Amino acid sequence: VYSNDNLDNSVLIGSVTISKNAPQYFQVPVRNMIIVSPTFSNPTADLFKPVNKGLYVNGDKPFYASLRFSVLNHGELITSKGMAGIGTEFRAVMAPMTANNDILNFMTSVMATEDNTKVTISDFNSNISFTDGVTRSSFTFTLKKGQSYIIDGTGDYSDNRNGAFIGAKIVSDKPVSITNGNFNGQY
């Protein structure tokens, strides 16, 4: 299991040995490797910029992995997509928000597999109010290997509801991995 350090180096943070009928678990040693760290004065501190968040798992043979974590009042399960989850063109998918509620959100995260990966996200409602307070018609950014870029919007703005970000087009010039959905959603 690898993660990037503060100097953008891919660092081995641990390993487990698995075999048929002998699954294992790995406890992430530091939660801020996977969870953003907002503060009262800067609630989007780790959003809308390249950050060293995320994990990369690798093995000698094919295997299945999932990520389970929890924060106060909420648990999350992220399934592994394997090599099928690596590519250069994706569409954002999440549950639509229909209620006016600031605890509901949508999110998309892009993680680079190679240095100097240019990513463009477009084809979404340009009236969306993202949590950084900026409305935009597209995103363009460059990531180093192992870096992530996290986008977030909440349900307390009418332009953010009813699937405004669903179907956003994510295109990169090198392979990336995408995680998207709702940290808090309506189902």
How should these model regions be labeled?
Residues V1-Y187:
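Intrinsically disordered, low-complexity linker/terminal regions across diverse proteins
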